[in-house]
Every structure is written in C-alpha cells, then in structure tokens.
A protein has these predicted regions:
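A membrane-topology feature that recognizes alpha-helical transmembrane segments
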Residues: 12-284
Length: 284
C-alpha cells in the first residue's frame, strides 16, 4: 500500500452527499454509451409489457418513475463526463433536433408509431443533454447559478399556471383520458399529438398508455446542474441526490393533486439549499 492510498480518507454516505468535497470526473471510465443502450432496452422492455395482462405490482404508476427518473439522471450524469466544446454541442443539438423531427413525422405517418416514439425519446434526451451542458459552460461564476435558479423556478411556476406549460398540460390530460378510455374499451391507442412529444414519456406496464414524466425544460436543467457541478467542481453525488429528491417530490404532488406540477422550483430550490455555501466559497 503506497502513501497516497494509506492517507486516503474513506467517505461515509453522509459525507459524500452533504460535504463540500468535489467528486472529479477525471480518471474514470464513462459508461455513457453502454448506459444509453441499457436505458433503451429497459424502455423497450416496459413497452413490451404493455400488452401483458395482470402484471401485478408493475401496474402501479409509481413503478414507472421509480425506474425511469433515476435512469434518466444517471444517463445525463454519464454523458456529462464527456464535456463537449461549444461547436460540438451545437452540432450535436442540431442533429438531435433533426432526428427528433424525423421521428416525430414517422410517429404520425406510420402504423408502428411506438417504435418511432422510442427513437424520438432518445433524440429528446440527446438534444436536451447537449443544450443543458452547453448552457452550464456559459456560466462564468458559481454564484451566478443563484439568480438562474430563482428566475427558472419563477418562470416555471407562471408557465404551469398560466403559460405554455398550462396549455401543454391540458393537451396531456385530454390525451391521457382518451387513451385510458380506449384501453379500457379494448380500442387501439392513437399516437400522441405533436405537443406531447415535448415530454419524456415512459411506457406503463400492463397498459398501452404512455406516462408523461418530464418536460423539455426539466431535462435541460438536469443536464445544466450536472454540467455546472463538473464545471465548478461542486459535489456531484449530492447534486444527483437532490435532483432525484426534487423530481420525486414534484411527481408525488402531481399524483396527489391529479394535475401537472412545476418541477423546477423543487430541483432548483433543493440544489440551491444543498450547494449555497459551496457556491459562495468557490465564487470568492
């Protein structure tokens, strides 16, 4: 055992999550591509279970986010280890938008729309990842994250109550009500309208209904916060925990009130509360 290994401190879970120790990404092997394959296979597996009756506890709506949201955050976390230059990020984002548009077209022009929605979801994740990571690189000082979080949370609240997100929520609720009725009656499910493709959906086992989870802005900010952790050497695992906690709270409230809830106030608020001392220290 060398001197470096002997002097290395063993961190407890509490210290990893709540100390201001930065968790560098250097010297590690990113598993971004294998994780993308795993994410897609799990998605397809849930999709295959859509036609299976009596799958028991899998019918519970909470199983979907319990699997999908941690996988999505981990996907952003791993791809965030591969920092892109500004030109590369713009190129990847444009390619992602093009691929998203192509798959959206085939969703509404072919009978096998579920296959194309799988690819559309991957394109949505790729585009939002590069957008969020690029925006994180444009932040000059860690303390600038504070007003960004405050403004983003306020805008999200107004959007969900009165703005575009409110309109999108109406479309989603209308589509889900029709889809649920069609499923109960044994009728085929129509493809989702174009606006619904701006949401991350996940197949719900035991039904043919796709469960909406997160919007474009939510996905961008997940990538943004993880990119900011990499850029300013903020505690990465703590940020991941806080993001998942915020997503979980917003989802539970949406389930309880049976209406769309703003996500950014929870993930932005928890991110600030957990990292405020570190943001001030690294900006001084």
């Amino acid at each position: 055992m060398d001197k470096t290994t002997a002097n290395r401190k063993t961190l407890t879970i509490h210290e990893v999550l709540w100390s201001n120790i930065a968790m560098p990404l250097t010297g590690r092997t990113p598993i971004a591509f294998p994780l993308t394959v795993i994410w897609t296979l799990v998605y397809l597996s849930f999709l295959a279970l859509g036609g299976v009756d009596s799958v028991g506890w899998l019918n519970n709506g909470l199983v979907v986010p319990a699997v999908a949201m941690p996988l999505t955050v981990l996907l952003f976390l791993e791809w965030g280890a591969l920092a892109l230059s500004r030109k590369a990020a713009i190129l990847v984002a444009l390619c992602g938008l093009l691929f998203w548009g192509i798959t959206a077209y085939f969703i509404h022009s072919t009978g096998d729309w579920r296959f194309w929605q799988t690819l559309n979801t991957v394109a949505l994740l790729g585009t939002t990842f590069t957008a969020g990571s690029w925006l994180a690189e444009e932040i000059l000082e860690p303390v600038h994250l504070i007003p960004v979080c405050i403004v983003a949370a306020a805008v999200d609240i107004l959007s969900v109550m009165f703005g575009p997100s409110a309109k999108l929520g109406e479309h989603v609720i209308f589509y889900l009500e029709n889809a649920t009725r069609n499923f109960a009656s044994g009728l085929p499910l129509d493809p989702p309208p174009a606006l619904n493709l701006l949401l991350l959906h996940w197949p719900r086992p035991g039904t043919t209904v796709m469960a909406p989870l997160l919007g474009v802005g939510d996905l961008v900010f997940i990538a943004f916060f993880l990119g900011a952790c990499r850029r300013f050497e903020l505690p990465l695992f703590r940020a991941t925990f806080l993001l998942l906690l915020g997503l979980g709270i917003s989802l539970l409230l949406a389930q309880f009130f049976h209406k769309p809830m703003p996500v950014l106030p929870f993930i932005c608020g928890l991110f600030l509360l957990g990292n405020l001392p570190a943001l001030r220290t690294r900006s001084s």
